[in-house]
Amino acid sequence: MYELIKKDGLAKRGRLHTVHGVIETPVFMNVGTAAAIKGAVATTDLQEIKTQVELSNTYHLHVRPGDEVVKKLGGLHKFMNWDKPILTDSGGFQVFSLAGLRRIKEEGVYFNSHIDGHKIFMGPEESMRIQSNLASTIAMAFDECPSSVADREYIEKSVARTTRWLVRCKKEMERLNSLPDTINKHQMLFGINQGGVYEDIRIKHADEISKLNLDGYAVGGLAVGESHEEMYRILDAVVPHLPDHKPTYLMGVGTPVNILEAVDRGVDFFDCVYPSRNGRHGHVYTNHGKLNLFNAKFELDDRPIEEGCQCPACRNYSRAYIRHLLKAKEMLGMRLCVLHNLYFYNTMMEEIRDALDAGNFASYKEEKLYRMGQSSIKNV
């Protein structure tokens, strides 16, 4: 159950009650594609860096180790040793982005594994069964994420099919949650809004899927090539057409600036690989912008990545030492940068929630953007 605690403008301060605990929103979900966050981050680290939700990938876990294996081992929570909420995406994005040759039919998608090339079929029912085997807290509906360069006619057909698939996802989820051997009989289902950069298609789709009374709603198919201004324009158009009393999830986004702008538009769930991916390459976030620790100017810098930061890296090590580890290709350097970045993101979400509680999100946002050397583009 989602509890809308208060609003500050369009920004939502919420709380999602789940079988695996309460999620305070707005929240950034830490991405662990194959049931682990890249960068040698263990689930035992997640508590220390303020993680509320871990996100894993249905497609990757279906291919390896196999969702049946995970089910036999008690589900993802037991498999990973993580007792807080987990969201699994449906596999749709990976099917349409990673897979080479694929055939889209009404029943689903036929494609080849990116690992060994073997043939796989995935449709709405298959995606729900896989996610039920994984026993995640929140399952995402199976959708088509069309190319950012697809024409309007194709987008319209794709969105209509995604709507039909969503109805099938809901029916299958209800069936699975009633089975005696299902691990998580309270698995939630989020639907996904699509429509490319076409506002009218997006709005019509949002209105249609809102009638299905799902546990939450996501905006998908953004951050796939369009400009930030286009993304914000779409959010301005579509978010008001999604239920206010349900979580609103912007998939795969994004930078700290993206998150601040999207919160201002009513979004309260986020995920993105940026903090871990950038960390693995020595790029770290601070309240004054991003640093590249490979830069020679940090060779003798004995300060932490950010003064006052309480992450494991900043409490114990200097920029100079972490730079040395990165240059020496020691895994510890990568790990420390990833831990710092995730802590930075999770702390920023904590600050956002505090600002919403206090009713001063607008001033917090402007100050945060100013310190990071950015400016608001709320009114693009």
Description of each model-found segment:
Residues G21, E54, D89, Q131, ...:
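Conserved, mostly hydrophobic/aromatic
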Residues M1-I183, A296-E299:
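Non-catalytic, usually N-terminal nucleic-acid engagement modules in DNA/RNA processing proteins
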Residues M1-R15, I23-G32, G39-A40, D143-V149, ...:
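C-terminal extensions of enzymes
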Residues S147-D151, E156, G216-L222, M331-M334:
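Glycine- and acidic
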Residues T163, E172, L176, N184, ...:
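Glycine-rich phosphate/ribose-binding loops and adjacent secondary-structure elements
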Residues S178-K185, Q374-V380:
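Short, basic, low-complexity termini and linkers enriched in Ser/Thr/Gly/Pro
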Residues N30, H60-H62, F93-Q94, P146-S147, ...:
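Short, solvent-exposed loop/turn segments at secondary-structure junctions
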Residues E126, I130, K157-R168, K204, ...:
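A non-catalytic, amphipathic alpha-helix used as a structural packing/dimerization or gating element
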